């Protein structure tokens, strides 16, 4: 099973078996903690829990609301919501992240302000997984992968479409 140089082939990166991807093997506590850290990093990038406010400055009229498992980024024309749904401790999955772009005003949890509602424009469902480089990545249903930083930028891009009055 050696090649012409006497080396044992290790296979292609796609051929490597990922035990965490196997539906019968529950994720480890370490994997669950790593995913929770990535969720926190994403939410901190989009809507920090303690945003620094300066008197007299505007943040492009984006209202950022943090929830225990997500955030709402609201402009006058639209919004982007990010929600994390962890799997149970006994489940074989780590959970899923939903990123939804809305036209209109989304009411955030705990708000007494009610509006006419919002229309869903675009939705991405992502699952966490280990990247080939050893870090965490987010995999969309269509196979697209995002690092946490790139996913945060993608959410901001979706929000910009509404801030600038564009259509998704």
Task: Please annotate each region the language model reported.
Residues 68-168:
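Intrinsic disorder/low-complexity polar-acidic segments
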Residues 1-65, 70:
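Charge-rich, low-complexity N-terminal segments
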